[in-house]
């Protein structure tokens, strides 16, 4: 199978790492006392029911503390897969599109004119990224894999498999583009994960990560260390480490990519404001979506992690999250979550 028809400088085999940080965010003082709008539903793609070739037993999910989780490889992944999480993942997909200026990624295969044949979406979630990519590239064969089956209608060139990406990869043909989004705290061995991606690419193919930094930051020291928001992040990182899938230092993955053989590596940093505290319209909008993503996701991110690893009770988690949610809305803390897009090319 031939690789994607992407023009690159002849003989370019060096590693070109570009760290791009967006300009420092300015506080919108007029908005400090206001609440973020909750009317986002009309622009969030809702999941649709469809038939599937996946065995019915896969749909037999596990109920735990009021949330459902994947049955296949039970308890390996600590985040839920129920309708509430599905809706949040769809919201998060829109947040990613806002961040990347309505593109699905920064790697060259995302150019609508690129000729890409086989594409793999790791940890596909609700499958929206794979579906969107398949719509833009109707001649590409797109495969999304996850521990839970997506429940979205897909075009004929997009398929889904329930699989564990940490097991040996058994694909019979390589891919031209492998995409991975928000897998930190879900992977136990990143060296192997990236090696598998490299090994399953065609020469000249691209691997791309979009990852969350995992720890809130502020440029003006307004993020209070004793706040419930900061405490919740520390506890989550502690729990994920105990569960064997710790949060990663995302910039360090550039070195891993270099070691396995990727070249032309580019890393771009973005900022997701904690709420709508920034003044500029783009980051204010991203902050509004980010707040809703966090408010909808915080229980799912913490419930299994805290109860399984830290031995909290369900009621303790819920009581703690009252303060966390209030903290997320606090516009006096000019916090943001760093988001990293990293891609590299397998040499010809």
PLM ranges: what are they?
Residues 113-177, 192-195:
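Class I SAM-dependent methyltransferase SAM/SAH-binding core
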Residues 191-206:
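A short glycine-rich, Lys/Arg-flanked "PGG" loop and its adjoining helix->strand segment in the class I
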């Amino acid at each position: 199978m031939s690789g994607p028809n992407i023009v690159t400088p002849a003989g370019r085999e060096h590693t070109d790492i570009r760290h791009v940080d967006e300009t420092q965010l300015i506080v919108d003082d007029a908005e400090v006392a206001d609440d973020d709008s909750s009317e986002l539903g009309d622009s969030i793609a809702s999941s649709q029911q469809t038939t599937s070739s996946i065995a019915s037993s896969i749909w037999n999910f596990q109920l735990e503390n009021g949330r459902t989780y994947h049955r296949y490889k039970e308890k390996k992944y600590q985040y839920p897969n129920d309708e509430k999480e599905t809706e949040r993942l769809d919201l998060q997909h829109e947040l990613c599109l806002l961040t990347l200026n309505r593109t699905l990624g920064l790697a060259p295969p995302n150019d609508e004119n690129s000729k890409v044949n086989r594409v793999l979406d790791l940890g596909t979630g609700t499958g929206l990224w794979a579906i969107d990519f398949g719509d833009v590239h109707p001649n590409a064969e797109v495969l999304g894999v996850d521990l839970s089956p997506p429940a979205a209608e897909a075009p004929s060139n997009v398929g889904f498999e329930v699989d564990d990406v940490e097991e040996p990869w058994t694909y019979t043909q390589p891919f031209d583009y492998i995409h991975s989004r928000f897998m930190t705290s879900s992977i136990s061995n990143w060296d192997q994960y990236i090696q598998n991606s490299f090994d399953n690419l065609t020469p000249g193919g691209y691997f791309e990560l979009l990852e969350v930094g995992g720890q809130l930051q502020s440029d003006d020291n307004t993020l209070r260390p004793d706040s419930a928001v900061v405490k919740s992040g520390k506890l989550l990182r502690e729990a994920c480490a105990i569960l064997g899938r710790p949060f990663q230092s995302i910039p360090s993955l550039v070195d891993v990519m270099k070691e396995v053989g990727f070249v032309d590596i580019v890393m771009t940093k973005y900022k997701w404001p904690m709420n709508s505290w920034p003044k500029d319209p783009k980051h204010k909008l991203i902050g509004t979506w980010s707040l809703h993503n966090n408010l909808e996701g915080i229980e799912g991110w913490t419930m299994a992690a805290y109860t399984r690893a830290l031995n909290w009770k369900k009621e303790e988690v819920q009581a703690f999250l009252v303060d966390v949610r209030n903290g997320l809305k606090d516009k006096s803390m000019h916090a943001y979550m760093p988001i990293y897009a990293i891609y590299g090319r397998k040499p010809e």
